[in-house]
């Protein structure tokens, strides 16, 4: 018998197939491997301002490459998974490239190929059309039914709606451009008063649309000097229009440059052009405001396409670097501007070609010990870069010419160094001696490098730094009664936007909660808030649709440059530490010729500083008053009636703040104990902490008692406070006999007068 032939196993076949696949894979992998010299290396660009590069000059990098360890050949490389091999290879020079041969080279005429193509093409087209016709027929039927149904509905609606304005409604979508042009022309105002300044028609059109009929004194004085190419130091009171005084000449230069480019027929790329102006401000809010005002001026100017880059903290650095690439005007705070310039490539070189350097609120930016970054920026702009040789000499000469063409514009309401001296303390006080214009010039010439030896110093109001329509007052009270008098002042001025200034962030947080507990629409603004929260507070406070009685409790962050319409009342909860701070705080009201009030709530220990403040600010007054601040006397009946409300609100606020602080401290101590591997006992820690005697022991004890208030006690206090707030403050009127003659019943029914009081209360006029 013959032996059966054994059948091969499936596993052996699979292994053979796998071997074949592996071999082919290895072969493909060997073809994909390249050496170091074949890779397309890219040079790493270093930042402009790098103190220590650590020897990494000429560093090169490459992405998307896997390293393969070989034998005798050493390291080899291949493209990462999903990337083609061509992406990592060095591009060959044109002479090294091999000639390409086209497979579809023409080799004469062929009748067969043509006929085949002619035959196959229509057949394929017919098949496609037949397949496409089947669904389209059904779709057409459905479309017809839908159209008929819509037509029936339209006829029914047309019969039901027989309104006379039907024709007008049908015209709305197709308004002509002529109608829009007529509306734009009607919106403008007469700007003939601006023509004497020699402005372009585009700027005059923008001013007309923005409804600026006449220029202010600082604008009349500064704009012609800046247009003539002079360096200018402008001093004017708050709210006098300093932003347009330097914004208009900058846009004039931009429009003139744009006209020259159009005449020459060249269109420069936005990314390659250097900015024409750098504007620096001390606060983020002021920078946003400058960008808004100059942006509106550029938006309404026909033919203007100026791009404004806003560089402030709290926002993405990478995004701001991208925006800076094609910007015409750069506005920002010194810290973020220096961070963006020093971390980028070629930005400092590009920024050194600016035509205008504007320093707003210069006394704050250039004061000693503040804004070190501002000095770095000024030094980088004026520094001649070293290391350029040979053919780059012409470039250096051009850049030196660009620096020589740069105009420096400096603006503020207070240039006097004497105003920056602290008012309180036992240090030697220099009295009311205010620096002359010559001394102010010397002070600024030491800080800045002007193009001209003697820049134009324009002082619009040499007698006083305060606005003309501002009324100043002072309320004297005890140190522990400031909350009471603040609430009373706010009741005296309902339906008016009020700005309350404090000297600390903790006071802002406490006062905001206190006023909110008293039923007042209070918002907070301080430097520790996130940038979005800061912008949100300013928008809510300044919005025309917001509560007209809105209150913004802020630190000196809001003291400079913030232009919010409708602020009628400024309250200094703490006396300012320096005279220039008082000038800028009070300048948030009585802007652009309007009237306003500024009141200081003064404790006995602050009286010395307030007297010095008045002597400094009003040293050159013609009437010779030593204390021009008018003393205000509040109705004692009102103060006594509202004391219970304020005490309850203060207890609730202090309890909430104490609970938050204790919880935060416990969480921190508990986390620290866990990290150390130690058991944390809060009672033992408190007993050990209470043994010592110190300055803050009484404060800690009050905080502990406030934190021990239970939820039920808090709820009871809230209910009592709510009941008190629901009633008007009675100032000696019998509620049973309202018609006794002391109350105007008709005015009460009409809602006239001050709705906070029941009875006659004299308004706070001074």
Swiss-Prot record:
It catalyses: ATP + H2O = ADP + phosphate + H(+). Disulfide bonds: none annotated. The keyword Cytoplasm does not apply. Residues 95-106 have a biased composition (Acidic residues). A motif (Q motif) lies at residues 192-220. Pfam families: DEAD, Helicase_C. Residues 485-635 form the Helicase C-terminal domain. ATP binds at residues 236-243. It comes from the Eukaryota. One of its GO terms (molecular function) is RNA helicase activity. CDD domains: DEADc_DDX24, SF2_C_DEAD. Keywords: ATP-binding, Helicase, Hydrolase, Nucleotide-binding, Nucleus, Ribosome biogenesis, RNA-binding, rRNA processing. It is found in: Nucleus, Nucleolus. One of its GO terms (biological process) is rRNA processing. Belongs to the DEAD box helicase family. DDX24/MAK5 subfamily. The Q motif is unique to and characteristic of the DEAD box family of RNA helicases and controls ATP binding and hydrolysis. This is ATP-dependent RNA helicase mak5.
